[in-house]
Amino acid sequence: MMRVIGLMSGTSVDGIDAVLVELWGGDRDLQVTVLNFCTVPYPDALRQRILEVCGAKSLTLAELAALDEAIAEAFAHAAQRVQRGYPRADLIGSHGQTVFHRPPVGDRLGYSLQLGRGDWIAWRTGMTTIANFRAQDIALGGQGAPLVPRVDWCLLGHATEVRCVQNIGGIGNVTYLPAQLEDPEGKGVMGWDTGPGNMLLDLAVTELSGSELTYDPDGTWARQGKISEPLVEHWLQDPFFHQPPPKSTGREYFGLPFWQRCRTDATGLAPADLLATLTEFTARSIVESYRQFLPQWPQRIFLCGGGAHNSFLRERLQVHLGDLPVETTAAAGIAVDAKEAIAFAILAYWHELGLPGNLPQVTGARQAVPLGQRWLGQR
């Protein structure tokens, strides 16, 4: 048994999800017990700095170093907070904060930058830390994303049921899980980024509310609006949605520039109508991605990430998915908000065991390898 802390902050830049888990077994026989979970919000000033950098604001190398360390300090604090009152963890798996992601193009390797240096976290906490999970996959020609499908296969795969796991963070990504009796090695597991998750909605709400809100709780504001179907169809013509997997994306593509385009296209729409239309666009982008690229229609879909709390978005997904059961991962015993942090605890654990964390058919990497770099803590 190993006690591991998982740390995650996604493209929504809401804060740091921290989980403390006990792990047994390897991959297919993996067992997880969650001991504690918390979300530690970023201080407002730090969140704003991160969003500015993600929005392509220039900064000096000294400013970059300072931001890297400030994020690492926040992650270290989250690790210390989640294990308070529990025996000392053996290991930390820290995803860090993505501030730039560029998929590979042609012969050029991809590039993905996560701030929140692992050496700082190891020094601050005294615990061995695994971080920089995406680099090894990228070095082997992969996208460096998504990295969660192997974890999904182990935790949420089913003997006879074909399933999809849809994460709705800032960006949406899906894992396709074939029935394990028919595919015991998981060779048919697929995964890719479906497009925007909460990102466009959050940008819209922030601007439309004059920064009084940073998101639309439960989709309440959007629910009051009327959907513009022509705009949804227009936005769905973007080339990303027709690009076959493996594929990944980020704030560079579906962040501020895309939002500005949507806002211009929606000139004259009332705020609630624009939010309703963006919600429909997000739901349709997910469902159309399934229709284009899934080898088989699933029998059940599990939602996770912040978007799983948006009941209006869930309703729009259900409208387009018909009678297909759509649940959250909580129905399978995995808390919606903790799932991604659990995944990076597991990837760190697999690193220690020498087990691969990526799936080449998902990321496009040449082979499966253990993920992350290791910084030794003080015993």
Curated annotation (Swiss-Prot):
Keywords from the named record: ATP-binding, Carbohydrate metabolism, Kinase, Nucleotide-binding, Transferase
Residue stretches in coiled coil: none
GO molecular function: ATP binding; kinase activity; phosphotransferase activity, alcohol group as acceptor
Xref: InterPro entries: Anhydro_N_Ac-Mur_kinase (IPR005338), ATPase_NBD (IPR043129)
Record's catalysed reaction(s): 1,6-anhydro-N-acetyl-beta-muramate + ATP + H2O = N-acetyl-D-muramate 6-phosphate + ADP + H(+)
UniProt-recorded name of the protein: Anhydro-N-acetylmuramic acid kinase
Pathway: Amino-sugar metabolism; 1,6-anhydro-N-acetylmuramate degradation; Cell wall biogenesis; peptidoglycan recycling
